């Protein structure tokens, strides 16, 4: 738990979409840093930060840049989950592209709300043009209480094996050794060529004089 957990971050509205939590039944979700957002804004963030179609298991708080870890939970009936629990229901296969701001930058949490509407049955928002193609089973993620500062994000990213790293980029000592061997081989070859020329040249000149 970071220092942000001690802040008064349980405000009455989502700091992203400014929707009142009292108008969104059970929609507030608290990250490990203590900042509170609505369910739909966090889902949009996860959709916009997918890598190769896979939802990431982390959320970076846009306020304090603290990383919150997520754990995946499978459920065939996501609508039956407790709305007050720290869960995020992420639809499978929904394309989502953040809209750039005036400076040309994109904020993953700031996505157009024009294509989203309030669902009367679940109290959550779904895209209007994607309702017919929604899968029956969604991905359920649980917001954990564990996190870390963004400066340590290198431990969050997937790591390659040591074999892949060494194969992709040789060690500096091996590179220097190879360069030294190449230079020594080139120098020996040059000395050998000069010695051969020095040995043959007098005989060539002598033959020309006799001729």
Swiss-Prot record:
Listed GO MF terms: zinc ion binding
Zinc finger RING-type: from-to: 14-65
A Pfam family that the UniProt record links to this protein: zf-RING_UBOX
Membrane topology, as annotated: Single-pass membrane protein
Segments forming a coiled coil: none
Record GO cellular component, one term: membrane
Keywords: Membrane, Metal-binding, Transmembrane, Transmembrane helix, Zinc, Zinc-finger
Keyword Metal-binding belongs to the record: yes
InterPro entries: RNF222 (IPR042973), Znf-RING_euk (IPR027370), Znf_RING (IPR001841), Znf_RING/FYVE/PHD (IPR013083), Znf_RING_CS (IPR017907)
Compartment(s) where it occurs, according to its Swiss-Prot or TrEMBL record: Membrane
Lineage: superkingdom: Eukaryota
Statement: the UniProt record of this protein carries the keyword Secreted: no
Transmembrane region(s): 187-207
Entries under PANTHER family matching the protein: RING FINGER PROTEIN 222
Descriptive protein name: RING finger protein 222
Protein species of origin: Mus musculus (Mouse)
Gene name in the database record: Rnf222
């Amino acid at each position: 738990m970071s220092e942000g957990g001690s802040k008064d971050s349980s405000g009455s509205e989502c700091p992203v979409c400014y929707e009142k939590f009292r108008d969104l039944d059970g929609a507030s979700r608290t990250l490990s840093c203590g900042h509170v957002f609505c369910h739909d804004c966090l889902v949009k963030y996860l959709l916009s930060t997918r890598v190769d179609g896979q939802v990431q298991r982390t959320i970076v708080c846009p306020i304090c840049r603290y990383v919150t870890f997520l754990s995946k939970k499978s459920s065939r009936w996501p609508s039956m989950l407790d709305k007050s629990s720290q869960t995020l229901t992420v639809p499978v296969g929904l394309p989502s592209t953040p809209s750039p701001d005036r400076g040309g930058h994109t904020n993953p949490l700031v996505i157009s709300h024009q294509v989203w509407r309030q669902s009367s049955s679940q109290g959550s928002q779904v895209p209007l043009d994607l309702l017919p193609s929604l899968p029956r089973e969604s991905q359920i993620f649980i917001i954990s209480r564990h996190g870390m500062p963004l400066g340590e994000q290198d431990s969050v990213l997937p790591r390659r094996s040591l074999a892949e790293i060494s194969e992709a980029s040789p060690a500096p000592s091996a590179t220097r050794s190879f360069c030294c061997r190449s230079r020594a081989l080139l120098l020996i070859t040059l000395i050998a060529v000069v010695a051969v020329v020095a040995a043959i040249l007098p005989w060539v000149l002598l033959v020309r004089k006799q001729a």
